[in-house]
From Swiss-Prot:
Entry annotated with the keyword 4Fe-4S: no
This protein's name: Thymidylate kinase
Organism for this UniProt entry: Brucella ovis (strain ATCC 25840 / 63/290 / NCTC 10512)
Lineage: Bacteria, Pseudomonadati, Pseudomonadota, Alphaproteobacteria, Hyphomicrobiales
Enzyme class, broadest EC rank: transferase
Stated role: Phosphorylation of dTMP to form dTDP in both de novo and salvage pathways of dTTP synthesis.
Top-level division of the source organism's lineage: Bacteria
Amino acid sequence: MSGLFITFEGGEGAGKSTQIALLASHLRNHGFDPVITREPGGSPGAEAIRHVILSGNAETYGPAMEALLFAAARADHVDQLIRPTLAEGRIVLCDRFIDSSRAYQGVTGNLDATYMAAIERIAIDGAMPDLTLVLDICAERGLSRAGKRRGSDTADRFEKEDIAVHEARRQAFLEIARQEPARCKVIDADRSQEKIADEIRSVVDTILTEKGLL
């Protein structure tokens, strides 16, 4: 894979989709043609599974089987979109990827790390992100933002969970970043959109320069 694979991680209301859009605009201004995608979803098969997961219907299967659903969606996403796009030398910007599974199913789902690592390995088949931007914000602030963004729409099953669960996921993302500093960059998301975007652009531009692409 010769392109650049960038993932955005963080809790509810961290501003991932906003920052992905701003980074995509920045990249287009520099002549790149980035592909924006998301998880769960990103391919027809994965989008079908997304509906099952976010509706809450998958909860009846239990955490272990739900993790397999996420893995199945991810495998299809990687095969149908991510890997072919990277093979074209393009940039992929993905809203959530493996670290969300580690935090959501692995940590707060209390699943064994060996089990999670095994299904992750099968699902991505070597398609690791080149850069993961962890947008960090305290759970209370993030949920408040998510509620304002949602308006009168119904909260999905994850937003409805207890604030302690959201904070545990936040800490899980931060721990992943501590363990994998070469891949992960923590971004303070409790700032203005412009300041966050400036830092993200700086990080990405540095990588593009190092690769001789900018």
